[in-house]
Amino acid sequence: MPHAVALMVQGTTSDAGKSTLVAGLARVLFRRGVRIAPFKPQNMALNSAVTVDGGEIGRAQALQALAAGLEPHSDFNPVLLKPSTDVGAQVVIHGRVALSLSARDYHAYKPTAMAAVMASWDRLVTAYECVLVEGAGSPAEINLRDRDIANMGFAEAADVPVILVADIDRGGVFAHLVGTLELLSPSEQARVKGFVINRFRGDLGLLQPGLDWLEARTGRPVLGVLPYLHGLFLDAEDALADARAEKGETRLTVVAPVYPRISNHTDLDALRLHPQVDFRWVGPGQAMPPADLIVLPGSKSVQADLAWLRAQGWDAAILRHLRYGGKLAGICGGFQMLGGWLHDPLGLEGGAGSIAGLGLLDMETTLAAEKRLENVCGTLNLPRSPAAAGYEIHMGVSRGAALDRPALQFADGRGDGALSADGQILGTYLHGLFDTPAALSALLAWAGAGEVESVDLAARREADLDRLADAIERHLDLGRLFPAEWVRG
């Protein structure tokens, strides 16, 4: 049976450019007619996406699937860890919640996780011409090397060649590359076929002596120096993107708190990128600034994040905001916070118990063991009934009179969320609430912006994937990585 061409991208650090490089290479090969799939053995992220087979994977792999012209599938990210505390995480295997484990217990569970990884790998390499693999963090973390399934442990088991990427914009790129290589075992070093330097800006001629030294020092080629691509929009996996982009005159101010276990913050990308919206993240210790709209985003640990929000004094700021006529929206965990009570009888987010919500909507939420995972579409219960589409990822079941006025009507007939009688507060389980152009325009009008231009996030994402692929084709030596027939032309 045919076996796919495989290549693994590992990085010297987190955010070195692994996800971006895999997405860009996937788009390059997709445009050349190659049947290509992305793969990340193990991902740790609170931003996830719903798959075509009813599971969830990291958003980076969903973006890479889009770059490859595919629907997201759970095999693209067979092990997803969703941290719920500083020392524990929910373990998602093949798209479904398997169990929750402490970091120490997960170490003992790794052989089971590795079996799931290899099962997905075996399916992909027989179904596609090429599989592009993304590592996690750095392969040189000494304390994580035992039973590693995310980096060289996987590369060795699957016999996959590796390229190493480093971010020169951070500084120290040569130390990162040489140091990482030297911390690997001899067999692992032999897998590293070359280096990619990411996010370079300046005169390449001034960098060339360093590249020559690196090649002489390591005996491995620099496969390319990728430029810093200003304004590139690709879904962030964990790190919050800079929200304060340079804009002209804005029509609306939107703020959102950054709680410790914030999840799926990409829900707010459309607001962050909108030219007429002044969007701001509000971090710990910061006062909630005056705004037209406050958005409470999703959370992986709703009770803990709500307690933390109160400790910041933001509950009082939200009440003050509403008294002055401001609008408030809650998405998923943020929606659950708006009710009277949150119950966790099974201790799914820590200790079993209940906590009072903000009391702004007449409803209560109970966390249940079964997670709802579904792509959905429908209409918003706002003027003109704009279309909305997105996905549900939640373990909570909400009940109460507030739900008699749903914020959305799904195509299957279900109502979702709540819209307060005075129209000030909107809550929903729909992730991607702002992504549909018609829904975005309607929500901005509801928040007080009036008629504003729309932003097509999907079109922007596609255009930036092509811009990334164009840069890779210009600056990377693809002939050293892939068969000649894929590279010609």
From Swiss-Prot:
PROSITE patterns, from UniProt? GATASE_COBBQ
Instruction: Name the Pfam families on file.
Output: CbiA, GATase_3
Pathway involvement of the protein, from the record = Cofactor biosynthesis; adenosylcobalamin biosynthesis
| UniProt-listed InterPro entries | Class_I_gatase-like (IPR029062), CobQ/CobB/MinD/ParA_Nub-bd_dom (IPR002586), CobQ_GATase1 (IPR033949), CobQ_N (IPR047045), CobQ_synth (IPR004459), GATase_3 (IPR011698), P-loop_NTPase (IPR027417)
Does the keyword RNA-binding belong to this entry? no
Q: Which HAMAP family does the entry mention? A: CobQ (MF_00028)
Instruction: Tell me, in a sentence or two, what this protein's role is.
Output: Catalyzes amidations at positions B, D, E, and G on adenosylcobyrinic A,C-diamide. NH(2) groups are provided by glutamine, and one molecule of ATP is hydrogenolyzed for each amidation.
What is the name of the protein in this document? Cobyric acid synthase
Native source organism of the sequence: Aromatoleum aromaticum (strain DSM 19018 / LMG 30748 / EbN1) (Azoarcus sp. (strain EbN1))
What is the gene name?
Answer: cobQ
